[in-house]
Amino acid sequence: MTTAAAIAVVSALAVSAHAQSIAGPYLAARSAALQSDFEQAASYFTQALARDPGNVQLMESAVVSQLAMGRIERAAPIATALVSSGQQSQIAELVLTAKSILDEDYQALAGKIPQGEGIGPLVDGLVGAWGLMGVGKVSEALAGFDKLAERPGLLGFALYHKAMALASVGDYEGAEQIFASDGTGSVVQTRRGVLARVEILSQLNRDGEALELLQRMFSGATDPEIDLIVAALNDDEPLPFKHVASVQDGFAEVFYSVAAALRSEAGPEYTILYAQVARALRPGHVDALLLTAELFETLGQHDEAIVVYKGVPSDHPAYHAAELGRSAAMRRSGKPEAAIEVLEQLARTHGQLASVQSALGDALRQEDRFADAVVAYDRAVALAEDSGGPSWFLLYARAISNERQGNWEAAEAGFRAALEVNPGQPQVLNYLGYSLVEKTEKLDEALGLIEQAVAASPDSGYIIDSLGWALYRLGRYDEAVPHMERAVELMAVDPVVNDHLGDVYWAVGRKREAEFQWARALSFVDEDDPLSEAKPDRIRRKLEIGLDAVLEEEGAAPLEVAQD
């Protein structure tokens, strides 16, 4: 072998070993990123980058993963290297901007016109204006907001932040003039925008207008934060302006308002980057915290959401909202008992809130603790009576719990009460109609209720199954067949629907097809669920001796075709 050939072999082996050394962490990182597991993705991308430091794709991915976890300090060195390599990266610019703000290097941001693509016109414009505020150039900053307002689609954001900038330096009159103008758009109609304006009006001793604004915007709806604000206004206590009390708060508000807007426009994996910057710049920004937790939930990262929700202090007015979110995330992550414990503790501290009692009822109902659920629902209904009355769903959920524990009289009354609140609600119409069919009560009314439900929700397998089953119970077997077949098309692996179709087939003489459907139902049934409507022992008995014989054994009425 020549020297050149030997060098080529050694070089090939080195390249192969290098490729193998990076492949493991890279593939693991890609897999984690696809599942939105940013914690693992950040770890593996960092490992891969350590083995291939100049790889700009790895740099970008590592920056994204670290930022998604809110780790600006870890993302910043990688972002610096990425930009230094000549690579244009919006996310790297986002990280470096956040790092400058954290370092209070406002001069670097004042009126900044980004080289390359920057972060984007909206963020770059707002950051530049707030940077000017940070170095004391208030007039130039206000002009910067005005210039940004001239760009299509950015007027509302620019004016909102101009109002916040004015209020942050005590010019509440100027801030209110902006809010009172017609051009501010939807940005100031958000809950956060409304509450900021309420604080400004209070600083101007215009408490009556502040109260009227709350009533107009929230239509009397209340929560602990609004209750505290209303009480202070009624007592003539001036509300401090807390929404943007400093330049740092202003920067945080930039990224929060962009994240809130992106929520309905972009994917959660992108939106969370802006929400995390807002949190990093202002750790006490509870709205940003709640948004971040909700985005983690949307991404299926329930454990991360649980951690973030836990960050809301127990004395904050939004604590109950955070605990409701934390319990929901626990339930979705397979920890139902822990979720119930959180809600039970919350009911001890915030039991005066109908939403807390209702959530506790829901969690208990989902664990088949129907008697306990009814107790919680009763409290929720009583509390709701004092604030406009209970929702149809609250009455419906309580009725289900009563029905499942055998209290049919209360259940029927509850379903009918829910229909008074929402007369055409298909879920309620279906549940009431189906329950009447199962009890062989008021069958004509039951059929009418279910037909209304089908008209309102024609693609619901459960509701179409109810219609077919009602027709079967009425002895209208031939009419039941197409509806039951359609229900099975929509819910192919549901044991109850397959069992029902088997019974209908048997009733019209299609016995072999009936046995096939019963066998399918048996393959899908959960043997460990005693509350399941599909009873495996009964299905097996039908397969052994047929439906007619089973009905005879049970002392039930035989199959009989309805007479016209």
Residue ranges and their predicted role:
Residues 51, 84-86, 116-119, 150-152, ...:
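Structural marker of alpha-solenoid helical repeat scaffolds
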Residues 21, 30, 55, 64, 89-90, 98, 121, 130, ...:
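Residue-level recognition of tetratricopeptide repeat
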Residues 34, 68, 102-103, 134-135, ...:
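Register position in tetratricopeptide repeats
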Residues 61-62, 95-96, 127, 161, ...:
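Canonical tetratricopeptide repeat
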Residues 58, 92, 124, 158, ...:
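TPR alpha-solenoid repeat register
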Residues 17-24, 113-120, 239-254, 385-392:
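TPR-adjacent "capping" and linker segments in tetratricopeptide-repeat scaffold/adaptor proteins
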